[in-house]
Amino acid sequence: PGSTFDWTNSDASIGLAASGTGNTPSFSSTNNSANPVTSTITVTPTANGCPGTPASYTITVNPIPVVVVPADIVVCNGAAVSAGVFTSTTPGTTFAWTNSNPSIGLAASGTGDAPSFTGTNNTALPVTVTVTVTPTANGCPGVPIAYNITVNPTPAVVVPADIVVCNAVTIAASNFTSTTPGSTFDWTNSDASIGLAANGTSDVLSFTGTNNSALPITATITVTPSANGCPGTPVLYYITINPTPVVVLPASITACNASTVSPSAFTSATPGTTFTWINSDPSIGLAASGTGNLPSFTATNNTVLPVTAT
């Protein structure tokens, strides 16, 4: 009874005065460094003018840990995302993290670093998630820090139906569409002889189909969509240009009245060609028109002059 106390504080940076008398007051602890700060409080009692033996105790103020997170990440659907490595200048710091949308392929939460994973986005739009990291050291939680991971979708392209036209016919423009905004399109043409360039970007413009051969020409148009730097799956459609068939006729025929004219066969280098014919003068004994080859007929001329039919 009657004792008084004088105390000293070895490190006033913790928020407590360097010295005082009586009990130590309440104070707000402070540590703006990355490491724990330990201060020694030495208390000397005095009674009846006689000093006692000093006694000491310590106050340790642990820092609030700060986490350093990766920069924001942007990847394509199906791409590998590297592990998110978290660091702190405070030794022994641990990390807990949450992910706002596990659909991208990363778990909803975890501890330590965020593991590597395969980015997943099965929608038509970019998906951006927030990864929030909370550091803890010596039982003291730090301020949560967030970074973003964006997984862009794989764009899909819708192409026209296959096109079949005749030689020299104008082909309308082919318009490509995608449900992913901002998609662009690159295309290739397997046979530029049809009148279309070998490659291009955006839509295929209108052109005149060309086929100077005797057989149909089918070109493969391969369209590859891209959006946000991510390529989509190429899609194909076909443009077929049918040739202009050419008929090979027999030699001109001269016959006498009442004689039999043999059948006349027509040919073409284009397979599947059919023939339609007309006769300018049915009086010769041949019908005015028909299909296929000319049939045999009996030549007729009841005049006194030669009759020529075309």
Predicted features and spans:
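Extracellular low-complexity Ser/Thr/Asn/Gly-rich intrinsically disordered segments
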Residues: 1-310
